[in-house]
Swiss-Prot record:
One Gene Ontology biological process: arginine catabolic process to glutamate
Function: Transforms N(2)-succinylglutamate into succinate and glutamate.
Name of encoding gene: astE
EC number annotated for this UniProt entry: 3.5.1.96
Name listed for the protein in its UniProt record: Succinylglutamate desuccinylase
Amino-acid positions noted as binding Zn(2+) in the UniProt annotation, renumbered to this chain: 67, 70, 164
Top-level EC class: hydrolase
Organism listed in the record: Shewanella denitrificans (strain OS217 / ATCC BAA-1090 / DSM 15013)
Length: 348
């Protein structure tokens, strides 16, 4: 299998050729400097053979394709993996890449049976249990994160960027969700790293969730984010020039280059916090705004956001912006997040 991968240095092609798994793990060396380990389909680790002393050591996870039709993050990760495999770039920090849902990539759909980004932190085993491939894969991805982070000292910085693109356009093209982390300050350095990636808008979440980034944050104290890099497009239709900042900064991060970050400044980024999550209670749930409304569209107090079960869902704050509206989710799941400005968060 090593020859299959190294013939063209295309880990995405290798993954899609084995969407449901590989027979066994394999590993090999790059030069005298890096141990490469393929743990599963879509799971590849680059492990430097010597500890990098020019910077504090980091443990970096880059994940994509938790939703199979979000292609730009897949292309970003695959390009970096190819540069590592061809030794154009050398990993100085331990780095794990995760291509989340290969069958959904084949299917060109967000998921096959169930939204995988609602299946972490043990949600995969609740209710019906491990009854289909996406639940089984979510559990496996958790296990790979645990294996990776626990393979290095716990006092080293742990980072996890779960890369996505959004279903609809956005007033802020690139934004990131900072998972709920009670008792821990938010990292100004991480916010400025994301800003250097072109991600100039941060949402502070207000409660535990079952997303991949929350799992890494809550279980391993990782600096973890769900990073939205634009709008969903099919393979071949992404304008990759729009992701050059992201590609450059992720490459610098993995390769140990100086990041050259500015000091944290709230004036350089847009900061929001989630004020509430509206879950679907009835099948007739319907939004009161246009289907094409952009993420971060704003509404004023008293406006009708949605109707369901004969009741109106009203804007409660002086102004609320919305992200991720989706009326088609199953009853009980989130239909939209409502946001307010967040000028006074605990950022250090």
């Amino acid at each position: 299998m090593q020859h299959e991968l190294m013939d063209n240095h295309d880990f995405l092609a290798f993954t899609l050729a084995h969407p449901h798994g590989i027979a066994q793990r394999f590993s090999f060396e790059l030069g005298q400097h890096t141990q490469v380990e393929v743990w599963d389909t879509g799971v590849i680790a680059f492990l430097p053979k010597e500890k990098y002393t020019a910077q504090a050591p980091k443990q970096v996870i880059l994940s994509c394709a938790v939703h199979g039709n979000e292609t730009a993050p897949i292309e970003i990760c695959n390009r970096l993996i190819t540069e590592l495999l061809t030794e154009k770039v050398q990993a100085k920090h331990r780095t794990l890449f995760l291509i989340g849902n290969p069958p959904a990539i084949h299917n060109q759909t967000r998921f096959i049976e169930e939204n995988m980004n609602r299946l972490f932190s043990g949600a995969h085993s609740k209710g019906e249990g491990l009854t289909h491939a996406e639940r089984i894969r979510a559990k496996a991805l958790e296990d790979y994160v645990a294996e990776f982070y626990l393979g290095a000292p716990s006092n080293e910085q742990r980072i996890h960027y779960d890369l996505h693109t959004a279903i609809r356009p956005s007033k802020h093209e690139k934004f990131a969700i900072y998972p709920y982390r009670p008792g821990r300050a938010y990292s100004g350095e991480q916010i400025m790293f994301l800003a250097a990636c072109g991600v100039d808008t941060i949402l502070f979440h207000h409660e535990p969730t079952t997303t991949f980034s929350y799992y890494s944050s809550e279980q391993f104290n990782a600096d973890a984010f769900t990073v939205e890099l634009g709008k969903v497009m099919p393979f071949g239709q992404n304008d990759m020039s729009r992701f050059e900042q992201t590609q450059t900064m992720l490459t610098k991060l993995v390769s140990g280059e100086a990041l050259g970050l500015s000091a944290f400044s709230a004036e350089k980024v847009n900061l929001y916090k989630v004020c509430r999550s509206i879950n679907k209670r009835f099948e007739d749930f319907a939004f009161n705004f246009a289907d094409q409304a952009e993420n971060f569209s704003a509404f004023t107090k008293g406006e009708v956001l949605a109707t369901e079960g004969g009741e109106q869902v009203l804007v409660e704050q002086p102004q609320e912006a919305i992200v991720f509206p989706n009326a088609k989710v199953p009853v009980g799941q989130r239909t939209v997040l409502c946001l307010v400005p967040a000028p006074n968060e605990n950022i250090r």
